[in-house]
Amino acid sequence: MKKEFIMLLLLLQTIMNLNSINTNTSTSIVKELQKNLYIFNSKEYQKDKDTLNEFINSININDKEILQSLEKIKNELFIISVFFNNKKGILIALNLGAEINFKYKISPISISIINNEFEITKILIDYGISLNQIDDTGYSPIFWAIYTNNEKIFEFLKESGADLSFTLKNRKTPMQAAIETENIKLIKSLEKKKIYIDDNFKKKLKKLKNKEIVRILVK
């Protein structure tokens, strides 16, 4: 990531020998990690993930003072826990009352799909996250499942009630996205549901180079 974590590491070294974290430290760690979200392939990613793991594991859930401190930053804790694939952190934040549909540029469920984290995606859906929310990326979760070719999460979203006819501002539908990626399994899955295809797009289908897609959709 762009910023160094020297100060953060010094804070961690200071509390290594303590039995539990203090309120100021918990806030500092969460705030520092939040500053550097969404650089998925950063060289610092694993180090930051390990930092969060150490932090989460040091939380004493029986310490009311610590929980009160975390409650003030529950949404921030929630989003960084999703980003760094920390299930324990996610559950702590949600049980503290974090907003399930809280988004910091990218929605939590979009992050879990991009990270290919099925279990976290399932947790978020079980807790009632919106399946059709469009975040700052301009896409809803079903589109992220399609564009990452994540068939398992796509099917789970479909079974969980995601809108398969959801239309973006540019009038693109999930079917059109699946055709773009040439994912035959997803195209067949959508076709079985008789998903809407824009009339203008239908005219272009016969000209597709992928004849298998043409055979499936042009009847």
Curated annotation (Swiss-Prot):
ANK repeat copies, ranges: 104-133, 137-166, 170-199
List, alphabetically, the InterPro entries matched: Ankyrin_rpt, Ankyrin_rpt-contain_sf
Which keywords fit this entry according to its UniProt record? ANK repeat, Repeat
List, alphabetically, the PANTHER family matched. ANKYRIN REPEAT AND SOCS BOX PROTEIN 8, ANKYRIN REPEAT-CONTAINING PROTEIN DDB_G0279043
- According to UniProt, the name of this protein is Putative ankyrin repeat protein BB_0399
